[in-house]
């Protein structure tokens, strides 16, 4: 497995990861290549998006880091980072999330972030456990979410 920056050519493989998560009942909606491009590869607030790629070239997971701006949909404080992690259930427990976070943490430090938010569904126990294992701490619980912070 290797990690590298996400590129436009990865959108289809990234959509496949999210759709595998959906098929496993761990995501509320399926997605497509167009949505991936807009939300993860080409957004104006992107700091970094990194993919984990298997030895066969298949995308195993990806992680995005965005800069929180005023009025963002997660109500994260302006200037914070906003992280999102997506790992295929077929690649679970193989160190994919840890490898992705190492790259994301490096990018956050280089960008000068002081805090990163992970807004996780209150019913997403796997996501909450992952972020806790990475060192995030719960700092607020708006309706239906558990928001965890990582302080750099």
Where are these regions (language model features)?
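Conserved acetyl-CoA-binding loop-helix of GNAT-fold acetyltransferases
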Residues: 84-87, 93-106, 129-133
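Conserved GNAT acetyl-CoA-binding A-motif
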Residues: 108-120
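C-terminal "cap" of GNAT-fold acetyltransferases
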Residues: 78-81, 117, 121-128, 132-152
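Residues within well-ordered alpha-helical secondary structure of globular protein domains
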Residues: 17-20, 133
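A short beta-loop-alpha structural element at the N-terminal edge
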Residues: 2-16, 27, 140
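Acetyl-CoA-dependent GNAT
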Residues: 8, 21-90, 139
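Alpha-helical elements of Rossmann-like donor-binding domains used by nucleotide-donor carbohydrate transfer enzymes
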Residues: 13-17, 35, 99, 103
